[in-house]
Amino acid sequence: KTKKQTGYLAHLWAKLILKFSNISYSIKGLDKVLNDKQYVIISNHQSAIDILVTFASIPNPIAFFTKKELFLIPIFGWAMKAAGMISVNRSNKNKSKSSVDEALLKINNTKLSILNYPEGTRTQFDALKEFKKGGFILAIKSNYPILPLTILYKKDMINNEIRLVVDNSIDTLNYKMSDRDILIDKVRSTIQSNLN
């Protein structure tokens, strides 16, 4: 319950920061997001602003994978932990696997949706990198649907709003672990088509 409440506070906090920063954004397809449903949200990643516009646009409480180093920052790190964010050690494959296991517990025991940037790092504009498997393994193991999210920036960001596009959620009930590459290709193609 606390993490759900913290998630809603993060939603309001993100909206306020964007408003006071004079950053405009719009979202298409919000009607495809059910308020009482949990998702594994798979998104492209282009800017540090991505997290803010996602939290501000999607009303559901969200946790996300983030670098373990950020948890060491005083106050900020504590706040992220309280909100249910998930630490990732990218230099250690076993630790990365434990992050997926932690996310699985979180999505099963809370009302949080999980946000995942499968590229693993920021990519400029319309060039998608290869997708890592962690978020898709989580979706298949948990049987929660994947919600593809595309964030669109113009190369000249001055006075241009950021656009978010939500596509239809993808049911993962019929996907086995051996099908994860098929699922990855499906989601990646959806996001790439919005970027083109």
Predicted regions and their residues:
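A generic structural signal for well-ordered alpha-helical segments
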Residues: 17-18, 80, 107, 139
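Non-catalytic C-terminal accessory region of glycerolipid acyltransferases
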Residues: 97-196
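Short gly/ser/thr-rich secondary-structure transition/capping motifs
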Residues: 20-28, 97-98
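Catalytic core of membrane glycerolipid acyltransferases/transacylases, capturing the structured
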Residues: 1-12, 19-21, 35-93
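A broad, low-specificity signal marking well-ordered, structured residues that form hydrophobic/aromatic
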Residues: 25, 62, 164
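Thr-Gly-centered strand-to-loop micro-motif
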Residues: 28, 65-67, 89-90, 118, ...
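Glycine-rich helix-loop-beta junction characteristic of Rossmann-like nucleotide cofactor-binding loops
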Residues: 29-34
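Short glycine-/small-residue-rich flexible loop motifs, especially phosphate/cofactor-binding loops
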Residues: 14-15, 77, 104, 136
